[in-house]
Curated annotation (Swiss-Prot):
SUPFAM superfamilies: P-loop containing nucleoside triphosphate hydrolases
Keyword set, alphabetical order: ATP-binding, Cytoplasm, DNA damage, DNA repair, DNA replication, DNA-binding, Nucleotide-binding, SOS response
Protein residues bound to ATP: 30-37
Species of origin: Chlamydia trachomatis serovar D (strain ATCC VR-885 / DSM 19411 / UW-3/Cx)
Record function comment: The RecF protein is involved in DNA metabolism; it is required for DNA replication and normal SOS inducibility. RecF binds preferentially to single-stranded, linear DNA. It also seems to bind ATP.
GO cellular component, one term: cytoplasm
Keyword ATP-binding: yes
Keyword Cell inner membrane included in the entry's annotation: no
Compartments (UniProt record): Cytoplasm
Record's protein name: DNA replication and repair protein RecF
Family: Belongs to the RecF family.
Amino acid sequence: MRVLSLFLKDFRNYTDLRLELGPEMNSIFGLNAQGKTNLLEALYILSLGRSFRTSRLTDAIRFGASHFFIEAVFSHKEVFHTLSIQVDKKGKKILFDGAPITKLSELVGLFPVILFSIKDIAIIEGSPSERRRFLDLLLAQASDKYTEHISLYHKALDQRNASIKAQNQKAISAWNSPLIAYGSLVAFLRNECTKKLNTIFQTLWDNTLKETLSLRYESSLITEESPTLNDIASNYYEQLRIANTKDLDLGYTMVGPHRDELLLTINDLPVAKFSSEGQKHSLLAVLRFAECVYLQEEFCIHPLLCMDDIHACLDQQRLDQLLQLSNSLGQVVTTSTICPDHRSTTSCIFHVTQAQVSLVAPQSL
């Protein structure tokens, strides 16, 4: 995928903006609070239908305006597409090539964006649900079927938990079948994704830094290195049977992919406890790069990589190493308060001041 242009109307501090992006590195710099991150937020909203900065999209409507409008023109496999979203107090309207999209599950994957920001620290320092969400978003960008599978799993889980609270053993048993079917598939896909991501991650990490890094999916349903889907389903059935009495006592389902964990270690030690802030941010940046490579190698999907406030997250040495890696990832958009010095014939540099974006280099696109 290549993003050709981005149009903003009454979004954050932008009244009216049309921005043309270069095919590879796009570096956006300017002082704080000028609108740099707003550009990445707009791209992210187009990708997932939600913001990484607020839970309410109406917060992004420019002060005094009634709605905001975002539109991107992009190419995928040499076919041009238009994706837009309009948000007002009544809700949002999403159009893909003029046709309405009514479900976010239909949107995810159409305009793939991988975002690296300082808020990614939650993947390391947050609860296991943050790491499960990381895997789920990656898999959802790869396949809309995954979104359907995990949605059906959570529906079955909610129904089973309601049956547990009602102490209805017949209903509990009835919901075990869909729970096992969808839950086993979710655990299987997450595990396979993690193994492939780990291989890519280690390769990228070895090219930049010397520490030993590892990603591992930890699940009570997975008891061997390369389980089949049937192996996981059999384990799930047995564990639900064993945990039935305890589930009734506690009032909820104890086992399943909703309890799983993605373990991140560096030199065989937990990253969250034994890594410096610099190591954590470097790890997260490489993890985002690994996502891009995973989507490219496994699904022939070329996402847009967005990196926010890179000089605040990374020291210059680590940043230089990572930017060298980014050259092979396709289209990239970065923001910083510092004017970049990685100028080349394939990079575009933009300056932002008071919601005005000007092209610094090259002179024209």
